[in-house]
Amino acid sequence: SKPVPQDEALVTYARRLNRTDAPLDFRQSAAVVAQRVLALEGWPGSTFEHRGVMIKVGAARGEDATSSGTPGRILSADRSGVRVACGQGVLVLLQLQRPGGKMLPVGEFLAGFPLAVGETLASAEMPAFVATAPFPRAPKA
């Protein structure tokens, strides 16, 4: 095979991941949040704060369903998943983990840590992973 020259105008830069990438922003579309959960699986993971506790998300999927709820509002919570309103669509949380616990299917998680319909989960800004210009380097210590 012959080398194919790349179009320099389409170059993107990726930065290193860190713990500040973990919090989720439910104001984004459900598809974007679900892709972020998948991208950050393992470390640093994806999290949201609820009642002062950081909950880690192990698996989620986006649904195109329309929701009239405020982004972050819990629409339903049962064994099939916790449905959370997003900026566009609905995010279904499938696996959750409390601090110091293990990752559980949502049905088992809800048995020990109920999430009530109507409660709102905290959103946090999700910084971009890629850019068209290089990211600034942190100063060396």
Enumerate the predicted regions with their spans.
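Donor/substrate-binding cores of folate-linked one-carbon enzymes
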Residues: 1-14, 18-20
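An anion-binding loop in the catalytic cleft
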Residues: 21, 26-141
